[in-house]
């Protein structure tokens, strides 16, 4: 019977049922790797990834160009911008270079998740990430560090499309938004720690040392990706062939993979709820991306903040933690539905935009910090709800690709163009206050787009049947995480 059924196990319901029973075999001992430990590991990896983003934007690592006064007195530059003599535009391009690798690799990793142990994919990606940041520390000009930043994006791609679905699957039913919020809380927290980390390292060591430190932090998690037992995502059934499980990265034929990805992409593009959510997210990320990169420099120039990295880092970490967690908890309290998620997104972004815009109108640094902190608190409340919509408006088997394309979209149309465009605007107007006000105004269209989603006919597809051919072929092991 095993031989006869081996060729069509992805489509035979009896075999699928038998496979489901085998997963629950009591012989398989529960793993020490509990859902909370899984969340912890993903959070730390996410934190390190965004520490890197914050560090490269910090004044300590990014630095400034050399300058000369009208009297002929010249001062040498500092950091990356000073060593490589980068213009503001080139500096903005450097912040966005990771997106090239992320754009190319995200759909590939998402499609491979149907046939390859996803933790092996994460292990490969984090290994590439580690080598890439080492390369950043060894770079010698603009193009060498830019290419290394592109490979940082390749490494990140393996992680962004798979982490959130795993968390969503293993979180308690009434705490899904809160668990997602904890994970996405690591984005502003990582940026903030990155500002502080960059400022501290840049003040005592060469800027290159910051990248080598990041590589040391990430290396254990890259190794973990290769040695941990496999997890199975909802919507991807293990194909038990009776053969020993292999961890080799065997993939489906190229033609099949490409056609499957294109078919899935079409399903995403015609989903009004998904598209509306992503359009709002793009406008939102356009602002947040430029804030994160240019914020310390703008604060230093507008308000003469002597410790801009530390101040922005402190405000961002507190507001990021409180705001992100609050958004997830509020959505769970309201009843986590797609319509309610859109309500949280539109209201918090609109009110937050008012406070952030008003902050830049004040000349007092203390008034600015107070208003901007409230604005950031509200704006960061979006992280849990926006990703809840991405995960629940599509079928389970589409979630990795939905997350991948969400990440690609918000970067390629959001923070990738925003950093260099803000640099161009600043080069033109030479006034950081005006530049910051123009940038902040973009939050209002984001709130308006998300408000449209409240009135769409939204259906939570989390419990819809998965596609019969969505099979993780290389694993016969029981699920790593089991409900208590």
Swiss-Prot record:
GO BP term, example: lipid transport
Membrane topology: Multi-pass membrane protein
Keyword DNA-binding: no
Protein name as annotated: Probable sphingolipid transporter spinster homolog 2
Keywords recorded for this protein, A-Z: Endosome, Glycoprotein, Lipid transport, Lysosome, Membrane, Phosphoprotein, Transmembrane, Transmembrane helix, Transport
InterPro entries per the UniProt record, alphabetical: MFS, MFS_dom, MFS_spinster-like, MFS_trans_sf
Gene3D superfamilies assigned to the protein according to its UniProt record, in alphabetical order: MFS general substrate transporter like domains
One Pfam family this sequence matches: MFS_1
Keyword Glycoprotein: yes
The species this protein was found in: Arabidopsis thaliana (Mouse-ear cress)
Transmembrane segments: 38-58, 93-113, 122-142, 147-167, 181-201, 209-229, 273-293, 311-331, 345-362, 377-397, 405-425, 436-456
UniProt cross-references to SUPFAM superfamilies, sorted A to Z: MFS general substrate transporter (SSF103473)
Region described as Disordered: 1-23
Compartments in which it is found: Late endosome membrane; Lysosome membrane
Coiled coil: none
Family: Belongs to the major facilitator superfamily. Spinster (TC 2.A.1.49) family.
